[in-house]
Amino acid sequence: MALWRASDNMVYLPPPSVAKVVNTDDYVTRTGMYYYAGTSRLLTVGHPYFKVPMSGGRKQGIPKVSAYQYRVFRVTLPDPNKFSVPESTLYNPDTQRMVWACVGVEIGRGQPLGVGLSGHPLYNRLDDTENSPFSSNKNPKDSRDNVAVDCKQTQLCIIGCVPAIGEHWAKGKSCKPTNVQQGDCPPLELVNTPIEDGDMIDTGYGAMDFGTLQETKSEVPLDICQSVCKYPDYLQMSADVYGDSMFFCLRREQLFARHFWNRGGMVGDTIPTDMYIKGTDIRETPSSYVYAPSPSGSMVSSDSQLFNKPYWLHKAQGHNNGICWHNQLFLTVVDTTRSTNFTLSTTTDSTVPAVYDSNKFKEYVRHVEEYDLQFIFQLCTITLSTDVMSYIHTMNPAILDDWNFGVAPPPSASLVDTYRYLQSAAITCQKDAPAPVKKDPYDGLNFWNVDLKEKFSSELDQFPLGRKFLLQAGVRRRPTIGPRKRTATATTTSTSKHKRKRVSK
């Protein structure tokens, strides 16, 4: 007998519709006008390990300048709507606005390739856990030693119209702070912050807040022992809805472990007894298992350089295909292949002594960096239709404010008081409220500001990157000086031959 029964399958409803994010190519029209912009030579000099404060009558301190810092350039561009455009019919200011699109970039790096060392004169290392015949179970009060390392090798370039996002592990909060005892391991929390100029990169010890998570101040080299090391959050920037934080990125990382040590100090989490068989004599109590390697970036070579070569942006990884909103770019750069630290020596006497005495000389260390930025920008137009303006207002209302567009407030239904004698002492002060000052959204963040408002040129063939762009675009340059070939005038010549007369015999 056949029986009907309801299906056991669940009924799935379609997900609710979401607002669609469109690509900038859908509402931005690119023109055929290209401009070159470049900086002068950008130099910075400082101490590679820490900031030197003012002392000895010195009015200014020495900044911290390390190859293991991020260099974040905030590039300011001119307003294209106030730009002198040679073609007056290019756009209609009543119905259109102009924006810049970055189509080419070259990051020039000066100085020779080199390896710079970092270290700590009181580095926390107990035993050599790789080559020692046995590990000591004794825990001396102070086993720190003077150790230097060549850190992780990194080359990085991130370009976008907003700062790049970094991530690091910081000290979190406990759910039950009453149960936390002194000496317990703190909870960890993943924190996302903008990458600023001068922030430390991951040098091989991880991305974390060493100042709050390592209270010994001797677990890592001097340059990061009281700093926060950040790592770019590629996952979040790749998932950015509008794709403003990362048009594209270039990166190359290289690392291996040179030495293997363990840390001195009491082990916080003891090894469970069922994981080993108890020994005798010096092996009765296991030594510290808190292992830590010394990183090494190994050899640097010109064959693996990411800099001093042009890059062309045809299609960005996100929805923003190189459009520079707010007329600015953020360029995040890291290059540890030129990390040489200069050592300088000066004598404490008026003259250099004839016999060497180390007590009569002072040693200093400095690090220098050299940059040269070049860009190719394309002029673009945006037609201000209702849909486009509504979409831009949803994305970033400040863009419309920069274009002198604003939302009219609703009419007020309340009465407004209007006094007759405004200068009378019998009434309250009638001074107008001051206009609100436009606040910088990145106020308080540290960047290397680069102003290119007066460095744009349409003569691309006069600049190195411009000539490379014309070559890859297949545009032939017209000669401007020198003799020109004249067009030959057409002349008619007779090619007919006279026929010989036949003579009859």
UniProtKB/Swiss-Prot annotation:
Q: Where is the composition biased (Basic residues)?
A: 496-505
User: Quick one: which gene encodes this?
Assistant: L1
Q: Which organism is it from?
A: Human papillomavirus 68
Residue ranges, annotated region (Disordered) = 126-145, 480-505
Assembly information from the UniProt record: Self-assembles into homopentamers. The capsid has an icosahedral symmetry and consists of 72 capsomers, with each capsomer being a pentamer of L1. Interacts with the minor capsid protein L2; this interaction is necessary for viral genome encapsidation. Interacts with protein E2; this interaction enhances E2-dependent replication and transcription activation.
Q: What does the record list as GO biological process?
A: endocytosis involved in viral entry into host cell; virion attachment to host cell
**Keywords per UniProt:** Capsid protein, Disulfide bond, Host nucleus, Host-virus interaction, Late protein, T=7 icosahedral capsid protein, Viral attachment to host cell, Viral penetration into host cytoplasm, Virion, Virus endocytosis by host, Virus entry into host cell
Q: Which GO terms describe its cellular component?
A: host cell nucleus; T=7 icosahedral viral capsid
Location in the cell? Virion; Host nucleus
Q: What is this protein called?
A: Major capsid protein L1
Family, per the entry? Belongs to the papillomaviridae L1 protein family.
**What does this chain do?**
Forms an icosahedral capsid with a T=7 symmetry and a 50 nm diameter. The capsid is composed of 72 pentamers linked to each other by disulfide bonds and associated with L2 proteins. Binds to heparan sulfate proteoglycans on cell surface of basal layer keratinocytes to provide initial virion attachment. This binding mediates a conformational change in the virus capsid that facilitates efficient infection. The virion enters the host cell via endocytosis. During virus trafficking, L1 protein dissociates from the viral DNA and the genomic DNA is released to the host nucleus.
- Which GO molecular function annotations are given, in alphabetical order? structural molecule activity
Q: Does the keyword Lipoprotein apply?
A: no
Source taxon at top rank: Viruses
Q: What lineage is on file?
A: Viruses, Monodnaviria, Shotokuvirae, Cossaviricota, Papovaviricetes
Q: Which Pfam families match?
A: Late_protein_L1 (PF00500)
- Coiled-coil region list: none
